[in-house]
Amino acid sequence: MAPRSAEASRKTKETDISVSVHVDGSGKSDIATGVGFFDHMLDQLSRHSLIDMTVRAKGDLHIDDHHTVEDTGIALGQALTKALGERRGIMRYASIDLAMDETLTRAAIDVSGRPFLVWNVSFSSPKIGTFDTELVREFFQALAQNAGITLHVTNHYGANNHHIAETCFKAVARALRAALEPDPRQPDAVPSTKGSLKG
């Protein structure tokens, strides 16, 4: 399997973002978005997926965090799409239930080339510190759309909003790790009867 690494950037009047990923990494991350809680979540995404990530983001944080979070999801998804190429030799599907104290969250992934998000997660507060909880969904929507993955995220239960958000990132990370693993029985095959995972 060829090295699965790529870069992507996005520059608008609202944000200036650069991302690099190495899918077959060890979970090293170098994250600086200007949004502390989001940096923490991206670090979890990298660490538990074993995807090495470098993220640099400058956004209009004087307005709010929305553009920075969403556009980082866009750039990260685009980098993953480039890194995966034809998506040959991958397991493609994965799901995981991930526990953190009182919280349990499920993530299921199909690296299909067809972007879709099903989101069954609710928060009891609009904020975690200064971070808008609605931005968790916005990030995963942007990631799924631009990475070409079908992603289902369901929070079964939980009381702590930080834990709910963190289990979303960790569950998606662990599911991504499993779905992107090389398939030793089909090392050069596109895992689709269509012969393509381009959408």
From Swiss-Prot:
Q: Which UniProt keywords apply?
A: Amino-acid biosynthesis, Cytoplasm, Histidine biosynthesis, Lyase
Enzyme Commission number(s) from the entry? 4.2.1.19
**Pathway assigned in UniProt:** Amino-acid biosynthesis; L-histidine biosynthesis; L-histidine from 5-phospho-alpha-D-ribose 1-diphosphate: step 6/9
Q: Name one GO biological process term.
A: L-histidine biosynthetic process
Q: Which molecular function term from Gene Ontology is one that the record holds?
A: imidazoleglycerol-phosphate dehydratase activity
Which EC class heads this enzyme's classification? lyase
Q: Which domain of life is it from?
A: Bacteria
| Reaction(s) catalysed by this chain's protein | D-erythro-1-(imidazol-4-yl)glycerol 3-phosphate = 3-(imidazol-4-yl)-2-oxopropyl phosphate + H2O
The places in or outside the cell where this protein is found are: Cytoplasm
Pfam families linked to this entry: IGPD
Q: Which residues form the signal peptide?
A: none
Q: Which GO terms describe its cellular component?
A: cytoplasm
Q: List the InterPro entries.
A: IGPD_sf, ImidazoleglycerolP_deHydtase, ImidazoleglycerP_deHydtase_CS, Ribosomal_Su5_D2-typ_SF
**Similarity comment:** Belongs to the imidazoleglycerol-phosphate dehydratase family.
List, alphabetically, the PANTHER family matched.
IMIDAZOLEGLYCEROL-PHOSPHATE DEHYDRATASE, IMIDAZOLEGLYCEROL-PHOSPHATE DEHYDRATASE HIS7
Q: What is this protein called?
A: Imidazoleglycerol-phosphate dehydratase
Q: Which organism is it from?
A: Mesorhizobium japonicum (strain LMG 29417 / CECT 9101 / MAFF 303099)
Q: What is the lineage of its organism?
A: Bacteria, Pseudomonadati, Pseudomonadota, Alphaproteobacteria, Hyphomicrobiales
